[in-house]
A protein has these predicted regions:
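C-terminal hydrophobic helical "lid"/dimerization subdomain
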Residues: 17-18, 290-294, 298, 335-384
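Glycine-rich beta-strand-centered segment in the early N-terminal region that forms part
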Residues: 46-63, 77-128, 170
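Glycine-rich Rossmann-fold phosphate-binding loop(s) that bind the pyrophosphate
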Residues: 62, 187, 211-214, 307
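Adenosine-nucleotide cofactor-binding segment
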Residues: 174, 209-212, 224-291
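Glycine-rich adenosine-cofactor-binding loop
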Residues: 191, 207-224
């Protein structure tokens, strides 16, 4: 089968001491500290075996995520920009949908021919976090497309418990568009968890989103679908601001033109002077967290979803005086996120397929990574 693979050199930065056994496993907790000179290529790999609790899926659509672009990009010292859990070599791709090709011997809930999408988070089920229902914070976490082979490939294997049926999306949108929409359930569920679970968003509250990539655009669409009193987006790309308008944002702004103080002023004006109840930070850009805290409503929340290699400076006095706070959010598992997002899409309340601005075959995927470095386009989708 054909697949897109990333490889890199194991070269821990000076002063970085990887945990015992990490070099042998080629597993970095923070790729930006360890992996140097990442390289992508499309190659032929053998068809993967299927364990009793797994399913083999023929991929129909797989998005290229901002995280994939961070795996591709290098800093001044040629380290990959991605600051999360990753091993190499690995097949990338974690936002996908497809058709079940074969099931493991223990599987009763799926059969060949079923249309599915799947969660990227592979939790162990046995650690304290998993026993507490906090699957995204599993101490033995594995991630499809980062620590085991993902779906930028003709075939992918994953555990059946990670899969969700998507027949309702195929019925609503038709096969071609339905599989594309289903591949967007994963990034939309990331935004869903950050907004509704971690930040406890409620209808009528106001939402400001930083970053108009797929997760930021999903936050715009979810805010509108869930009855936000006002939704605004801060995003440098004019093309992405237009996509947000199609999803129902009330206003969009270019933060580079405004500067940090201008962003605060615009946010105050858009919220009648009180600040926003919820800021969704989906960019991973430097300096934006402090800006958001300066335009928070009393007891408001900044949901931190975007991953970036930069450290943040914030003024805790601002948070104390307003009773507001920061909430980190990682992943999408648990809390019914996937099922709820699928139902929102199938009901016509949320159409994330609107953000797809380019579809390519697998052989064009590496070029798409290069093109996405300018953060100007919407979602690039690899289709099979």
């Amino acid at each position: 089968m054909q697949a897109m693979l990333v490889e890199a050199e194991w070269a821990p930065r000076g002063g970085v001491a990887p945990e015992p056994g990490a070099a042998e496993r080629r597993l970095a907790r923070n790729g930006n500290l360890v992996w140097r000179r990442p390289r992508f290529r499309v190659t032929d790999l053998p068809e993967p075996p299927v364990a009793p609790d797994e399913v083999l899926i023929r991929v129909r659509a797989c998005g290229i995520c901002g995280s994939d672009v961070h795996l591709y990009e290098r800093d001044a010292e040629e380290y990959m920009l991605y600051p999360g859990l990753v091993t190499t070599p690995v097949v990338t791709g974690h936002e996908f949908s497809g058709v079940v090709e074969r099931v493991g011997s223990a599987i009763v809930d799926f059969q060949p021919g079923d249309a599915v999408c799947a969660e990227e988070i592979a939790w162990c089920g046995a650690c304290l976090a998993c026993k507490s229902g906090q699957f995204n914070y599993c101490s033995r976490l594995e991630e499809l497309g980062f620590t085991f082979n993902g779906a930028h490939a003709e075939l992918v294997v994953t555990r059946a418990r990670s899969c969700w049926p998507i027949h309702s999306l195929v019925r609503r949108f038709g096969a071609e568009r339905g599989f594309v929409a289903a591949a967007l359930v994963e990034p939309t569920s990331v935004a869903y968890l950050g907004m509704f679970v971690q930040a406890s968003f409620r209808p009528g509250q106001t939402v400001a989103v930083i970053g108009g990539g797929p997760i930021g655009l999903a936050a715009v669409g979810l805010g509108r679908a869930a009855g936000a009193g006002r939704v605004v987006l801060f995003e440098p790309s004019a093309a992405r601001r237009q996509l947000a308008e199609a999803l129902g944002t009330d206003a969009t702004f270019d933060p580079r033109a405004l500067g940090p103080d201008g962003v605060v002023r615009a946010a105050r004006e858009e919220s009648e002077g009180r600040g926003f109840d919820l800021w969704v930070e989906a960019s991973g850009a430097q300096g934006v967290i402090d800006t958001a805290t300066r335009a928070l409503a009393p007891t408001g929340t900044v949901a931190l979803i975007g991953l970036g290699p930069h450290r943040a400076d914030i003024d805790p006095v601002t948070l104390i005086r307003t009773g507001s706070g920061l909430r980190g959010s990682l992943g999408h598992s648990g809390h019914g996120a996937f099922g709820n997002v699928i139902r929102l899409m199938a009901a016509g309340r949320l159409d994330m397929s609107r953000i797809v601005t380019r579809t390519v075959g697998l052989n064009q995927a590496v070029g798409c990574l290069e093109d996405l470095r300018d953060r100007e386009a919407g979602k690039c989708m690899v289709v099979f």
